């Protein structure tokens, strides 16, 4: 996970949600040093175990009660159990990644600090900080409102189902630990999305630095070049020049139109620095995939199963009582789970797309640069880009990009048909 000046707010939110058991200290040079916090390590493990225990305790309470609120049929029991279990697995995997990925986190942030120093002229930490805080605030506010609406709806349904000597509202109370897990899950997704978005943002800034440093200047030089060549031709043809005058004209031409050897070397060093930064960003992508790959996998599975389960309960309600309040809440849950899926997929897709743009810019630079020193540096950068893979993956099982959305759409439709058929057969 990224722990930097722009994302420090998300880091503190993650600590409260048991996802970042680390401590940060600012050294004498002003840099943030990251280490393990044993207090928050114990806090993360304890909170996770307690919440998981209470969640399954509430699930069993509703399943074994005389009047179940959510588990009314055999199919609904299976769907609800899967719905709860996949959230639990996502939370456990996220906390596990936070507990055991300290080395990857240290390497990731060390690389990001060096990259930010290279791209210092294009950094805007203030805007990045507000974007990160805005993403976290909107996400947590949305899940708070949605959980409140859902609990209120189920409380109303439980009161309508209540009979003498039974307290169906207690069944809903036992689901509150499960709803609390959604806050941890949302914090985990905000953390991953912020890190992936930060990598994509740095890829984009590197591309802008490449374009402004090499393409803009070459375009200006090529626009001036014909005028200077024409001037030399007039001197040599219309008025016979003495050897000393001709030498002076050629010297002036070389000094004005061709970059000096020192300037070419400086540009070569700049290009090498940008190539190193691009390679380091690619390694940061792999570090994030390795450290949080299992969490991303369970998040994707949870999005898939939640979309299936929520749509299933929505169809059941449409075919039976048609409670308007319940229908609206289920539709809001579907929108939330879809946005939750996009929160993971879209930053990863944008980062990979910005990484692929770099090779297009380098190819354009290669066509316009003719100095031997620069041409060799551009060629090495181009060869490096041919083998760079900046795509995020979930434990190597699938690439996290927009193509996964079509697979999800077909899978949701298939599973919905199967569940509805089971419901009609078994009731």
Swiss-Prot record:
Changing residue 421 to A: Complete loss of function. The chain crosses the membrane at residues 38-63, 76-96, 136-158, 169-193, 294-316, 325-346, 403-423. Pfam families: 7tm_7 (PF08395). It comes from the Eukaryota. Changing residue 333 to A: Abolishes fructose-induced current. Residues 1-37, 97-135, 194-293, 347-402 are cytoplasmic. Ca(2+) binds at residue 421. GO terms for cellular component: axon; dendrite; membrane; neuronal cell body; plasma membrane. GO terms for biological process: adult feeding behavior; cellular response to fructose stimulus; chemosensory behavior; male courtship behavior; monoatomic cation transmembrane transport; regulation of appetite; regulation of feeding behavior; sensory perception of sweet taste. Changing residue 418 to A: Results in constitutive activation of the channel pore that is further activated when fructose binds. Beta-D-fructose binds at residues 70, 83, 182, 310, 337. Keywords: Cell membrane, Membrane, Receptor, Transducer, Transmembrane, Transmembrane helix. Changing residue 310 to A: Abolishes fructose-induced current. GO terms for molecular function: ionotropic sweet taste receptor activity; ligand-gated monoatomic cation channel activity; sweet taste receptor activity; taste receptor activity. Expressed in the adult labellar chemosensory neurons and in the adult head, abdomen, leg and wing. In larvae, is expressed in taste organs, as well as the brain and the gastrointestinal system. Its main location: membrane. Changing residue 337 to A: Abolishes fructose-induced current. InterPro entries: 7TM_chemorcpt. Changing residue 306 to A: Significantly reduces fructose-induced current. Homotetramer. Gustatory receptor which mediates acceptance or avoidance behavior, depending on its substrates. Gr43a is the main sugar receptor in larvae. Functions as a narrowly tuned fructose receptor in taste neurons but also as a fructose receptor in the brain. Necessary and sufficient to sense hemolymph fructose and promote feeding in hungry flies but suppress feeding in satiated flies. PANTHER family: GUSTATORY RECEPTOR FOR SUGAR TASTE 43A-RELATED, INVERTEBRATE GUSTATORY RECEPTOR. This is Gustatory receptor for sugar taste 43a. The lineage of its organism: Eukaryota, Metazoa, Ecdysozoa, Arthropoda, Hexapoda.
């Amino acid at each position: 996970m990224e722990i930097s000046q722009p994302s420090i707010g998300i880091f503190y939110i993650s600590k409260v949600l048991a996802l970042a058991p680390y401590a940060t200290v600012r050294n004498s040079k002003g840099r943030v040093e990251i280490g393990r916090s044993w207090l928050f390590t114990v806090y993360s493990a304890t909170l996770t175990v307690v919440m998981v225990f209470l969640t399954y305790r509430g699930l069993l309470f509703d399943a074994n009660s005389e009047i179940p609120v959510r588990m009314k049929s055999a199919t609904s029991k299976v769907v609800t159990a899967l719905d709860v279990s996949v959230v639990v697995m996502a939370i456990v995997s996220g906390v596990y990644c936070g507990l055991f990925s300290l080395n990857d986190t240290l390497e990731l942030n060390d690389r990001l600090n060096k990259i930010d120093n290279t791209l210092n002229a294009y950094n805007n930490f203030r805007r990045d900080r507000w974007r990160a805080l805005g993403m976290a605030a909107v996400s947590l506010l949305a899940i708070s409102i949605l959980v409140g609406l859902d609990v209120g709806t189920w409380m109303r349904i439980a009161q309508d189902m209540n009979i003498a000597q039974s307290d169906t509202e207690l069944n809903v109370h036992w689901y509150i630990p499960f709803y609390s897990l959604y806050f941890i899950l949302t914090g985990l997704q905000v953390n991953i999305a912020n890190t992936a978005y930060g990598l994509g943002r740095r890829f984009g800034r590197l591309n802008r630095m490449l374009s402004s440093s090499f393409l803009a200047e070459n375009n200006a030089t090529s626009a001036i070049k014909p005028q200077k060549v024409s001037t030399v031709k007039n001197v040599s043809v219309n008025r016979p020049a003495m050897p000393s005058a001709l030498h002076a004209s050629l010297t002036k031409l070389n000094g004005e139109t061709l970059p000096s050897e020192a300037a070419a070397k400086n540009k070569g060093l700049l290009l090498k620095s940008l190539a190193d930064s691009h390679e380091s960003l690619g390694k940061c992508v792999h570090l994030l995939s390795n450290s949080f790959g299992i969490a991303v996998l369970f998040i994707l599975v949870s999005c898939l199963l939640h979309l299936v389960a929520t749509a299933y309960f929505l169809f059941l309600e449409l075919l039976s009582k048609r409670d308007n309040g319940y229908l609206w809440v289920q539709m809001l849950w579907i929108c939330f789970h879809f946005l939750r899926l996009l929160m993971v997929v879209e930053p990863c897709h944008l980062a990979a797309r910005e990484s692929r743009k770099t090779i297009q810019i380098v190819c354009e630079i290669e066509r316009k640069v003719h100095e031997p020193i620069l041409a060799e540096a551009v060629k090495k950068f181009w060869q490096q880009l041919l083998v760079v893979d900046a795509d995020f993956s979930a434990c190597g099982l699938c690439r996290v990009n927009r193509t996964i959305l079509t697979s999800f759409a077909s899978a949701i439709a298939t599973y919905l048909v199967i569940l509805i058929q089971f419901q009609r057969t078994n009731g």
